Design a protein with these regions (language model features):
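Charge-dense, helix-prone N-terminal extensions
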Residues: 1-112
């Protein structure tokens, strides 16, 4: 269900679930990571954290860029990544959701 790759360039790691992007990470550390969320949560995150801005080249309504991930507590960052994953899964077709649900996972691949 989850894959990772470099579809844009050699320093931008993209995570997908069933072919749909849920996380984009700049491995050089220049722009941080981009995550999807609900429009309400997007605005709340931007108001609370100065390092969070609208994501470049993505819908500003649904995507945030977290510029300095080191200022965010690790548990909160993990929670936002999980939220992004689940929002994308919720937007999948029923058929793809069913395929994902029925996929076997090894212990190190499972996403909670």
């Amino acid at each position: 269900g989850v894959s990772e790759g470099f579809p844009f360039d050699e320093t931008t790691l993209v995570f997908k679930v069933m072919g749909k992007i849920f996380c984009i990470a700049d491995l050089e550390g220049n722009t941080g990571i981009a995550l999807k969320n609900t429009p309400e949560k997007i605005m709340e995150m931007r108001e609370e954290w100065p390092c969070i801005t609208p994501a470049s080249h993505l819908s500003h309504i649904h995507w945030n860029n977290i510029g300095d991930t080191f200022t965010i507590p690790a548990t909160l960052l993990k929670s936002w990544i999980d939220d992004s994953y689940h929002i994308v899964v919720k937007g999948l077709t029923r058929k793809l959701q069913e395929e994902l649900k029925n996929m076997p996972y090894s212990s190190n691949e499972q996403i909670e």
